[in-house]
């Protein structure tokens, strides 16, 4: 498995009435890191005929992040085949897992928005290096 990593710093806009990072912020970060990783994986390859659409999110909140915390986000591609690809994301604070997520993406045709089988070229991009 090839792990992609980035960092986030908790800002005032991320904090909710419970004085910790709001669950919707983690969802945004999941989307952000998925996009960053996909951009890196497809570098130099024209994939404009396709788009990924989320069909399921599963998120486990194990700990919390507070104002000013530095959060390390890690993602990797899991089981992929047919029209679906599973992406795993984990968030760490001080090397301790605080959020774990799994997102199921469906590949769709960019013009028709109909699900389409994942091409061999895309499978190769997603395969562990």
What function would you assign to each model-found segment?
Residues 1-72, 79-129:
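Terminal targeting signals and extreme-terminal segments of soluble enzymes
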């Amino acid at each position: 498995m090839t792990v992609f990593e980035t960092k986030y710093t908790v800002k005032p806009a991320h904090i909710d009435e419970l004085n910790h990072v709001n669950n919707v912020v983690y969802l945004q970060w999941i989307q952000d890191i998925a996009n960053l990783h996909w951009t890196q994986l497809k570098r130099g390859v024209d994939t404009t005929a396709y788009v990924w659409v989320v069909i399921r999110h599963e998120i486990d909140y194990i700990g919390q992040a507070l104002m000013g915390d530095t959060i390390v986000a890690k993602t990797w591609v899991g089981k992929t085949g047919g029209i679906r690809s599973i992406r795993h994301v984990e968030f760490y604070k001080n090397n301790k897992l605080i959020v774990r997520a799994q997102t199921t993406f469906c590949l769709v045709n960019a013009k028709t928005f109909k699900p389409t089988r994942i091409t061999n070229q895309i499978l190769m991009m997603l395969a562990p290096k």
